[in-house]
A protein has these predicted regions:
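Bacterial Sec-dependent N-terminal signal peptides
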Residues: 1-28
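Short, solvent-exposed aromatic-acidic interface loops
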Residues: 39, 63-70, 141-143, 158-162
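N-terminal, polar/charged subdomain of small-to-medium soluble alpha/beta proteins
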Residues: 53-56, 142-144
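Glycine-rich, aromatic-bearing surface loops/beta-hairpins
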Residues: 110, 116-118, 125-164
């Protein structure tokens, strides 16, 4: 009787475990190294936020924040509006700000289902007492987009991605 119970339990685990495994595969994510090279601007460290933008141009998710002091997040105006409407714990995806001429390498995680599906990565940048760049860099979230070097228009000189 004990063996019959064990076999039944094993059968149920295998049968019911398959949908969960399938669900986990559809929500799988890939980690990428993101290297940001800054221009040689003069001034304080730049606060930069990397956001996932949907096909309609709306913010969907914060992927990384460079700049640890929350009191300056309001300088990233468009992202801060999104954050106010849809608060999320970003402590695990927050790092140091980046100064002029420096580079930063961080790891970001992107859901595989978002690749080649009309999404973009937006890099917003702000420096104290200087211009705010809502779209310093915007990269199509495609295989080709992540494979190439993307030039910035503000404090960011360029961004490159590589598989982690």
């Amino acid at each position: 009787m004990s063996n019959l119970f064990k076999i039944t339990l094993l059968f149920l685990l295998i049968t019911l475990g398959k949908p969960a495994a399938t669900f986990a595969q559809t929500n799988a994510a890939t980690k990428y190294k993101c290297m940001i090279q800054m221009t040689n601007y003069m001034g304080e460290g730049a606060y930069i936020v990397i956001s996932l933008i949907d096909a309609k141009g709306a913010y969907e998710k914060t992927l990384y924040v460079m700049g640890p002091d929350k009191k300056w997040y309001n300088s990233l105006k468009e992202w801060n509006k999104f954050r106010a409407k849809k608060p999320a714990n970003i402590s695990a995806i927050t790092g140091a700000s980046v100064t002029g001429g420096d580079r930063s390498v961080n790891t970001i995680e992107i859901e595989n289902s978002k690749m080649n599906a009309g999404y973009k990565l937006r890099f917003e940048s702000a420096v104290e007492d200087k211009t705010y760049n809502v779209k310093d860099v915007e990269i199509p979230l495609t295989t080709e987009g992540l494979a190439s070097k993307s030039e910035g228009t503000g404090y960011i000189r360029y961004v490159r991605f590589s598989p982690n």
